[in-house]
Structure formats: structure tokens, C-alpha cells
Amino acid sequence: MALPPSSPSPSSPSLQRLSTFKNPPPSSLSSGAPPPQTPSSSSSSPLDSFATDPILSPFLSSSFSSASFSSAALASGSPASTAERLHQAIRLLDSQLRNDVISRHPELLAQLSSLSHADVSLSSLRSSVSSLQSSIRRVRSDLSEPIKSIRSKSVQLSNLHTATELLSHSVRTLRLSKKLRDLADFPDPDKIDLTKAAQFHFEILTMCKEYDLFGIDVIDEEIKFVTEIGEKLRSEAMKVLERGMEGLNQAEVGTGLQVFYNLGELKSTVDQLVNKYKGMAVKSVSVAMDMKAITSGSGGGFGPGGIRSSGSPHIGGGAKVREALWQRMASCMEQLCSLVVAVWHLQRVLSKKRDPFTHVLLLDEVIKEGDSMLTDRVWDALVKAFTSQMKSAYTASSFVKEIFTMGYPKLVSMIENLLERISRDTDVKGVLPAINLERKEQMVACIAIFQTAFLSLCFGRLSDLVNSIFPMSSRGSLPSKEQISQVLSHIQDEIEAVHPDARLTLLVLREIGKALSNLAQRAECQISTGPETRQISGPATSTQIRNFTLCQHLQGIHTHISSMVADLPSIATDVLSPYLAAIYDAACEPVTPLFKAMRDKLESCILQIHDQNFGADDADMDNNASSYMEELQRSILHFRKEFLSRLLPSAANANTAGTESICTRLTRQMASRVLIFYIRHASLVRPLSEWGKLRMAKDMAELELAVGQNLFPVEQLGAPYRALRAFRPLVFLETSQMGSSPLINDLPPSIVLHHLYTRGPDELESPMQKNRLSPKQYSLWLDNQREDQIWKGIKATLDDYAVKIRSRGDKEFSPVYPLMLQIGSSLTQENL
């Protein structure tokens, strides 16, 4: 069944009207009166039930569609019930609307009354507005003529004021122009006050621009004159300024700057001047490196002495071109120094001079925040041009590369002299110098490519010499003295070539050090090893002689180079020290095994002292030395004859360089070791009779004689010799005298303590006896211990002795016991 077409449409407006009536009107809310209580307001609204009704709730939606609702109703299967439900809702809404109209009837009447009052007020307002408009028209008509008159008079007054101002400014301009003419017509042009004229010039042009005086005939005539005078002022001021910069005259520079400041052109003029000097610096560098100009001036064209397209001169012209290049470089350095100092002088005056009227610092007008200083601008351009020219010379011209590489010390000397002169000439208290350390390093870095090439060439020359005298291909061949002298002479030449330059000297010394390291490695490869090199029983073999010669060569190199660097600063010694140490170690290696073998031989002879009977009382003692001492003497004499005669320097050359030779040092150490080793084992001899003491004294005398005559002067050995001379009379002292004897001051405490065991009872065992060690084993242990550690071992034996005495119930100790404790306690106190 179809729904009535009119049923959905009235329902929606009815719902909307109902929602409007639910809220009170604004007038009633604003009056503050509570709304009247009606049955409809107290009861629930029909819309509340509609919201929960599945059929009526779609009508409350803002997106309600009648077509969709009708389709849904037809599809539900009960359209009749739906239509009936809608009719009920319409009746309910109509009833609700009637109730609302009835309940709000007084309010509706009040609204109608308000509308009537508003209409009356609006009619009265229209009448008032019409009257006001009529009055305005009458006033406008009355005031139009006076306003026109006022406007006309105002224009006339403004024109008069403008004409008066123009006339006033024109008169002032003409007066300034007359003053400027008076200055320009001064009889002596050199005495014209340029700064005052510049001030007049600036004021005239400023007034003309500011007050638009151009176009006035008399002013235009004066402007022509002012313009001409301005050009003359600029020209004269620039001459004064440049003359002052060249002559470093602060007064002239200040005058020139003041003129341009008064002209209002200070910054542009200074920038232009600095750019000019930058261009001059760049051009100076370019001209100095212009090989075409050099060759044309030193030999001409492509004739003899000319230059080929490759950059290499013809035969016969190289020397002239080289000399011309160096002359141009020297001239370039002079020009660069003058340019930089001139710009610095300009900057110096700018930083000190202030305008006498405004007190403005001129430097602040020229250099704004973030701008670089004038000298920095010129220096940066100079360094850039110099770097470019040097790179071009290195890559484009092999001839120039060779000149600057071979003559790098001269090149760097020129640059450092330039830097030193600039620093010296611009070192003024209270003024920034022209260049700082960073700027100097930039200039030196410009020729870094030639420095690298020069150092490589230096190392290459030295390496070639080293490789030629120590070829790896022919092991066993030794260089001659002439070849060694050639190497030393070449090293000295390399140092002398750069000696005036401390920085370059250190760099060359590092290259020399690399060459010395290479020499030490190659020399070590030539050292012969094996048992034959350590034999000391027969004459020196050819292998040993080769090692001796190699040692002497390396010793000579070490001594000679050490004397070279002695006159250099200490840092030079620090640079070469590790490389000289490598040479020294290489020089020691051929002979150290020989001296060690000889020392072992002499120690084995001395150890035979323990096989002798020094405890016997033999009245028939002969005057001969002990057999072990005779063997030791023969060994020393043989070593002297066969080996030391070849190794030790002659008396004329013994102290040429003021340093001890390697073999002399090894011989001295061996002699000291023999003396100390002997008195150590002599102190361990037990028992020792009076006859044994005499025999031991005889042996010590023979030892002193053998060492002094064949090894090293014993009086130059120091402590070992004093110990030997003290031990000989010590053995003859009474035990009671030893504690106060000054002899023990020249002996190691362990020697005295070991000797006291000889004077003690048998039950007082020495550490060697207690630990059942052989003399050689005990001696090796002593070599690795300090005196306080040796005392600990001795103290343990003394404690054992005291325990034995106390265990027997004895109260008396051997006289040596308290004496040994006294010596040991003093040793302990010294180490605290």
C-alpha cells in the first residue's frame, strides 16, 4: 500500500518547529524571569520517544531521505502498519504544537508589541537622518569658497618656502664654491690645503644632491668647476698617498687618506689601492718566473743560450739562464717586501688616524666587521700567485725544476730572508705586524714540492754512496778508507749546504739519518760470525781482521758525524741520536764477541785461585807468582799482542774527537771486571794462612802490573783499582783493626764480609758453603744481586752460627761475628 504523499513532508517541518519551541526566546532569557511551568514542559518531549523509535528515529537525522525511507517501508513487508505509525506521530505532533502555542500565548503577544514599538522608532530615526543630511549640505555649501582660498594660499606659501630654501642653499653653495676657488687659485700649488679643499668639494656636491640644486644655471656653471677641481684633488691626493707609502711617511699617508675621507671616497680608494698593490705583487712573481724573458735577456731567441720549447736551454746557455733566474728571484723578493711593507704602512696609519671633527677612526670606515685586513688581502694574493707559479715551474719546465731543486737551500733562504725583513720592518709596538707565523708557513709551503724533491735528491745521493761501498751482491768486501772519507765528506757537504737554515738543517739531518740507518743495516750484513771470530788462543785470523776493520770504519763514521753535530743546536743531536746509536751498535757487533770470549778466559783463570792452597804454612815460598796468575798474564799478553794492538787507537789518535773508542771502552770494562772479579774470589779463599796472604799479595801485584801494562792504565779505572789497592793491605790487618780501618771504605761491603769468613771458625759457613755452590755458580749469583741482597744471604749464615753457639750453651762468639753484624747494619741503614 502506497503511503500518502503528504505525510512525510509535513512531519519534518513539524519536528523542526517543535525543536524551536522547546527553547525559550532570547528576550525571556535575558530578562532573567523563569519560564512558566506548563504541562508540556514538565512532561517529556515527543522527540525523546522518536529518538528511540526504530520507525521514527530516521526523521531526526539531518541526512533524512524520503525516497530511502519509503523504499525501506515497502521492503519491510508491513507498509500499512508503518503508515499508521506515521499518522499517529503526526497527530501527536499537532497536539504538542497546539499545547505549546496555548502555553506561550502571552509571550507571543509580547513579541508582537515589541515589533510595533520598533517600527515607530524606525520612522522617527528616518526623519532625523533626513534633517541631518540637509544641514550637512548647507555647511558644505558655506565652506567651499574659504577652503579653496586656504588651499591656494597654502600652495603659494609652500612655493615661497621652497624658493627661499633653494635660494639659501644656492647662496651657501656659491660661497663654498668661492672658497674652493680661492684655495685653487693659491699662488703656490704645493701649499694648497688639500684636505680643506676636499671638504668644500664634498659639501658642495652633497648640498646639490640633497637639495636638488641641479638645473639652476649659476649652480650648473659652478658644478663644472667643482668637478674639475675634484679630479685634480684626487690626482694630487693619490700622489701624496703613494709617495707616503713608498717612503713610509706617516704624515703624507695621513694627508692623502684625510683628503679621500673628506671626499667621501675613502673605502673605495683604499680598496682600489690595495687591488693595485695586489696586482703588482702578482705581476712581480709572474715576471720573475717568465722563462721566455729570462732566456731572451740572457742569450736571445733560439740562438746559443736560448731556450727550447721544452723549457731546457741550449748547450752553453744553462749557466746564464740559471744566474738570470736567481737575479730575477732576488729582485722579486725585494719588490714583494716593499709592496707588503707599503700596504702595512697604509694599514698602520688607518689604525691610528681619526677624523679631527667626527673623531671617527679611518680604519673602521675601510674595514667592516668580517672583512680581512689589508695586508692579509695582499698576502693571500701573493701566496696564491707564488704557489701557482711554483707548481707550473715544477711541472712545465724541467730546467727550472732542476734549478730550484738543486738550489732549494738558496730558494728557501731568499723566502726566509723576505719573511724576516717583513717581520723586522713591521715590528712596531701597538701595531699588528704585516704577517704572523701562520702567514710565514703559507709562504714556505709554496715551495714544498721543491723541498720534497731536494730531500729526495739528498737521500738519493747518500744512498747511492752507501750502496756503492756496501753492495748487497758482494758479501765480504769492505770499503776502503778513501770510500769512507768520501761518504763523510759528502755528509758534511750536505750539512754545510743548509747550515744557515735551522729548519732545513733538521730536515736534511733526518735524511742523513735514514742513510746512516741503511749504512748500519748493510754493514751488519758484512759482519762475519761463528767460532772463528771468537778464538783468542792463536793469532788474529783474516775473518777477525775483517771484523776489526769494519768496526774501525763504523767507529770513524760515528766519531766524525758526532763531531759534526756537536756545533749544531741540541735538537740536531736529538734528531741524529737514534741513527748514530744504530751505527754505534753495528760497530760494536764485530768485536763484542771477541772481548766477551777474552773476559770469560780471564775469569776462568781467576777461578783457579780456589784450586790453590793458600792455607799452608810453607816457609820455603818462592818469589814466583801462582800458576793461575802466570796463565792469566800469558793470556793478557797474547791478547794485547795479537788483538789489542790492532784494535786500540794509536797514541796520536787516542782522543782525537774527545770520545772514547769502542775497543778502548770494551778494554776498560774488561780490565775493571778482571780486578773486581779477582778480589771477589780472593775474598772467598778459605783458609788463608800468613804464607797464603803473602802469596796472594804477590799475585795481586802481578795482576796490577799485567792489567796496567797490557790492558788499561789501572790508575784510570777508578773504584776497581782503589778496591784492589785496599784489599791487599786489608788481608794483613788484625781483625780488631778492621772495623775502624779506612780501607773498608774503598771496598764493596760484600768483599769485606766474605773475607771475614776466612778469619772465622769453620762452623761459620759462607753462603757459598751453606748452599753447596761452586765458586763459579756463586759468582754468577753475586753478579745479579745488589749489596743489600747479598747481605741478606750473609745475615742468614750469621743467624745459623748464633743458633749453633747458643745451642751449645756458649756465650762467646767469634770476633768476626759482631764485626760482620756492624758492617751489615751500616749497609742496611744506608739503603733506608
Curated annotation (Swiss-Prot):
Highest taxon above the source species: Eukaryota
Protein's UniProt keywords contain Phosphoprotein: no
Name of this protein: Conserved oligomeric Golgi complex subunit 5
Family, similarity comment: Belongs to the COG5 family.
Region annotated Disordered, chain positions: 1-49
Pfam families assigned: COG5_C, COG5_N
Any one GO cellular component localisation term in the record: mitochondrion
Membrane protein topology class: Peripheral membrane protein
Taxonomy of the source species: Eukaryota, Viridiplantae, Streptophyta, Embryophyta, Tracheophyta
Assembly, per entry: Homodimer. Component of the conserved oligomeric Golgi complex which is composed of eight different subunits and is required for normal Golgi morphology and localization. Interacts with COG3, COG6, COG7 and COG8.
